[in-house]
Design a protein with these regions (language model features):
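Short, polar N-cap/turn motifs at the start of nucleic acid-interacting alpha helices
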Residues: 193-202, 217, 290, 310-330
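Short, basic (Lys/Arg/His-rich) helix/loop patches that form interaction surfaces
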Residues: 164-167, 254-260, 265-268, 276-317, ...
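Basic, Lys/Arg- and aromatic-enriched nucleic-acid-binding interface segment
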Residues: 99-103, 107-111, 122, 130-189
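DNA breakage-rejoining catalytic core of tyrosine-based enzymes
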Residues: 77, 126-129, 139-160, 215, ...
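Short, aromatic/basic-rich helix-turn unit that serves as a nucleic-acid recognition element
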Residues: 1-5, 30-64
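A Lys/Arg-rich helix-loop hairpin that forms a DNA/phosphate-binding surface
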Residues: 22-36, 54-55, 68-90, 146, ...
Length: 353
């Protein structure tokens, strides 16, 4: 019986190595082709790919698959800048006549090309160094930065509609995103794969919840949390945020433990897609246009703060950013800002005259 079991395990291993879905090192030996480098990047235990969050890996996999399936057979040493431009144009082509160009698709592919070539450079592959030098001198049109944001008036309308729909959790979630200027992930958390037998915390069907706001983040009226992306600790005095405080005070005292935002149906933190689904349902009931997404609450927070005259560095710290340029990327230029600039310019002319 032991012999049979060992033989079964051996055959199982051979099957997995042969399988197209396996990422074992044996299947991912670098042979100079782009495909082999893509697969090595995904399989190598020392690859930076291993440090990515699961959701980011999924995004990367999309672009990597485009390269693997469409230009993977190309020898990296033979790829020129002209080839890369041609690939970009091909990836950008509409899916069907009359449909828009797929700029996001093309940009994702080129971004992943940069990633894997930089990985190859870290392995001191000369062909990757040459192609990397060429790529560093090339620019490609990406998706335009979002210009939408959520306003305070829309948040108020959303809160009202959420309570009418029996979803106080959604009223709380969006209010916290807007008032605190936090990423959605830092408010509602995210569910990460965790199949370990001794998984701790909140676990559901092989997924473990992490990174969301809990009551342990609040001491008195001060909310303090380390953000998931930058690791920067942000602090907010809820006494200065009446909307957020009002929503929190709706929570019964006996429920004030664990995650702040819980799905009324499951009693667990929201899955991302369920949260965004309910956001759209309630947003439509509140008269908020479909082009406004829940993630735009963060841009709304930054824009409102800068419009109100807050110092950019203060806004940067409140949003948990480590660079001012990141904060500026969330700022949606408004008429108030351009009017303020015009007033200052006109006033300066009077002083000169």
């Amino acid at each position: 019986m032991r012999h049979i079991g060992a033989r079964c395990r051996d055959l199982q291993g051979q099957m997995l190595e042969w399988s197209g879905e396996n990422r074992s090192p044996a299947r991912n030996v670098y042979d100079g082709s782009l495909r082999s480098l893509v697969r090595l990047y995904q399989a190598d235990e020392e690859s930076p790919y291993r440090d990515l969050r699961p959701r980011t890996q999924t995004f990367y996999d999309y672009g990597l698959k485009l390269l693997d399936e469409n230009v993977g057979e190309m020898a990296i040493a033979a790829v020129s800048g002209a080839d890369v431009r041609r690939w970009y144009k091909k990836f950008k082509e509409p899916k069907a006549d009359g449909e828009p160009e797929r700029v996001r698709r093309a940009y994702a592919a080129i971004q992943m090309l940069r990633v894997v070539i930089n990985y190859g450079r870290s392995l001191k592959l000369p062909e990757c160094r040459d192609l990397g030098d060429a790529l560093s001198a090339m620019e490609f049109k990406g998706v335009q930065r979002r210009e939408t944001r959520i306003t305070h008036a829309q948040v108020c309308a959303f809160r009202k509609a959420a309570h009418e729909a029996g979803r106080p959790s959604m009223a709380l979630g969006i209010t916290l995103q807007f008032d605190l200027g936090m990423r959605q992930r830092d408010v509602i958390g995210e569910w990460l794969p965790d199949t370990s037998p001794g998984a701790e915390g909140i676990v559901d069907h092989g997924l473990r919840w992490s990174d969301g706001l809990t009551f342990s983040h609040i001491t008195g009226t001060v909310l303090r949390k380390r953000t998931s992306k930058t690791g920067k600790v942000v602090e907010h005095d809820l006494a200065q945020l009446p909307d957020a405080l009002a929503e929190l005070e709706r929570i019964p005292p006996l429920r004030r433990i664990g995650p702040l935002v819980l799905n009324e149906e499951t009693g667990l933190p929201y899955k991302r897609r369920v949260y965004t689904k309910w956001f759209r349902i309630i947003a439509r009931a509140a008269g908020i246009p479909d082009e406004v997404w829940s993630m735009d609450a963060r841009a709304g927070a930054v824009t409102e703060a800068l419009d109100a005259g807050a110092q950019p560095l203060d806004v940067m710290n409140a949003a948990g950013h480590t660079q001012l340029s990141t904060t500026q990327g969330y700022d949606r230029t408004t008429l108030k800002k351009t009017a303020r600039v015009a007033q200052l310019r006109v006033a300066s002319r009077k002083n000169v005259e």
